């Protein structure tokens, strides 16, 4: 894929983007992680109670109007346009009422799809549906241990009132990310920084989408694009503009240089 490529992810998506940046080394030129679900074992999924919250969450209503009212109450802090999109795409009519103008509706994403983000569905392999030990997903903790292997500049964009990106969590992210200089080229710059959106929680991109977008655009435009255009992109263009003959000549000169150094 042609660079530059920017990775952007929120919550579990932030964890997945960060994981991809390590497992597919140097795929991103930079990444922006919004309140990512990344933390040490004491901050892992087993400690957050997300499974209990999911089981308590209502997923069905008698009418679409009831569902809309419930969602607007639960997500009252969200930007109105974002909330309208949530309501439009997150509920659907139950199969038996498709032909009716109104009737029972359900969430498009059911409890199972959400629960498997937090708890491993071990019954799929064992066939034993009940009685098994609960095993939480380890992705956020795994990624925490891999932060040192991140190979690109990283911006952490956090909600000022978020219970996930606490000052302690942000301190760990900033100190560990890209600390090992893994696969770093000579002269390559890797910035790691944070931005805080005041008066927002974990759902900051839904609560303040414009402010988040402005911060992301500023990071990409003023920082990362400048670095890319001045250094990495320029170097790549020099190589692409060479003929095959000149590329071979450069390779031979490089080999001779190595013989004098090794």
UniProtKB/Swiss-Prot annotation:
Pathway: Mycotoxin biosynthesis. It is found in: Peroxisome. A motif (Peroxisomal targeting signal type 1) lies at residues 260-262. It is an enzyme of class 3 (hydrolase). Keywords: Hydrolase, Peroxisome, Virulence. Disulfide bonds: none annotated. Abhydrolase domain-containing protein; part of the gene clusters that mediate the biosynthesis of the host-selective toxins (HSTs) ACT-toxins responsible for brown spot of tangerine disease by the tangerine pathotype which affects tangerines and mandarins. ACT-toxins consist of three moieties, 9,10-epoxy-8-hydroxy-9-methyl-decatrienoic acid (EDA), valine and a polyketide. ACT-toxin I is toxic to both citrus and pear; toxin II the 5''-deoxy derivative of ACT-toxin I, is highly toxic to pear and slightly toxic to citrus. Gene clusters encoding host-selective toxins (HSTs) are localized on conditionally dispensable chromosomes (CDCs), also called supernumerary chromosomes, where they are present in multiple copies. The CDCs are not essential for saprophytic growth but controls host-selective pathogenicity. Although conventional disruption of ACTT2 could not be accomplished due to the high number of the copies identified in the genome, the high sequence identity among these copies of ACTT2 is likely an advantage for RNA silencing, because it allows knockdown of all copies of this gene simultaneously. The gene is ACTT2-1. Induction: Expression is positively regulated by CSN5 during infection. Disruption phenotype: Abolishes the production of ACT-toxin and impairs the formation of lesions on leaves sprayed with conidia. Does not affect growth rate of cultures, sporulation, and spore germination. It holds the Pfam family Abhydrolase_6. InterPro entries: AB_hydrolase_1, AB_hydrolase_fold. One of its GO terms (molecular function) is hydrolase activity. One of its GO terms (cellular component) is peroxisome. The keyword Hydrolase applies. Its EC number is 3.1.1.-. This is Abhydrolase domain-containing protein ACTT2-1. It comes from the Eukaryota. The keyword Hydrolase applies.
């Amino acid at each position: 894929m042609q660079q530059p490529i920017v990775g952007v992810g929120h919550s579990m998506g932030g964890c997945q983007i960060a994981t991809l940046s390590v497992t597919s080394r140097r795929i991103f030129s930079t990444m922006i992680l919004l309140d990512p679900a990344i933390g040490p074992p004491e901050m892992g999924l087993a400690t957050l109670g997300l499974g209990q919250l999911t089981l308590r969450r209502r997923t069905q209503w008698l009418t679409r109007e009831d569902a809309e009212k419930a969602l607007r109450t639960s997500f009252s802090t969200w930007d109105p346009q974002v909330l309208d999109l949530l309501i439009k795409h997150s509920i659907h009519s139950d199969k038996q009422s498709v032909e009716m103008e109104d009737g029972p509706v359900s969430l498009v994403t059911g409890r199972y799809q959400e629960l498997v983000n937090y708890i491993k569905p071990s019954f799929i392999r064992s066939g034993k549906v009940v009685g098994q030990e609960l095993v939480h997903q380890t992705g956020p903790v795994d990624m925490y241990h891999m932060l040192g292997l991140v190979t690109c500049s990283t911006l952490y964009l956090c909600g000022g009132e978020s219970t996930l990106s606490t000052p302690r969590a942000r301190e760990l992210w900033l100190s560990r990310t890209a600390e090992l200089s893994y696969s770093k080229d000579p002269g390559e710059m890797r910035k790691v920084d944070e931005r805080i959106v005041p008066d927002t929680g974990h759902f900051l991109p839904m609560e303040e989408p414009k402010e988040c977008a402005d911060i992301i655009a500023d990071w990409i435009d003023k920082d990362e694009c400048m670095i890319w255009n001045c250094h990495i992109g320029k170097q790549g263009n020099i190589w692409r503009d060479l003929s095959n003959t000149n590329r071979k000549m450069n390779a031979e000169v490089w080999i001779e240089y190595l013989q004098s150094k090794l």
